[in-house]
Amino acid sequence: MKYKHIIWDWNGTLLDDTWLCVEGINKSLEKRSLQTITKEIYRKVFSFPVEDYYERLGFDFKKEPFEVAGDEFVAYYAKCFHKVKLHKQVSSALGALEIAGFSQSILSAGKQEYLDQWVKVHGLSEYFMIIRGIDNQ
C-alpha cells in the first residue's frame, strides 16, 4: 500500500454545505445592497484568507470591519447548520477506507469546538485519528 493515511477537508468535501455558505454570504450581501452570488461564482471566488474573498465580493472594510460581516455569516451558518447533510456515500466510503487499512483525519478551517460537534452529530468521530480545526475565528 503506497498511502496509509487520508486527510479530509470537512466543508464542501465530506459535508454538503456549499448551499448554506452561498445562502449565508448572500444574506450579508443583500443587507449591504451588494450583488448576490450563485454556487458557481462561490466556487470560483472563495479563497483564504476569507477577508480577501469578502473584498472580492464587494465588502468595504474601510466602512465596516471584516469581523462584522464575518461574525454575521458564522451566526447564520450556526443557526441553519441543522439542515446540512453529508455528501452521499460519505459514511460508506469512510467505512470502506477504514476496512482497507487506511487511517483518516480531518483538517478544516472551521473552529475546533464546532468541528468536533459537527463530526459527532453526523456520527463520524469513530473514523478519524485526528480532527483539527482552528483555535480562533
Q: Predicted regions: what is each one?
A:
Residues K83, Q112-Q137:
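Substrate-recognition "cap/lid" segment bordering the active-site pocket of phosphatases
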Residues E30-T36, I99-A100, G123-Y127:
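Short helix-capping segments at alpha-helix termini
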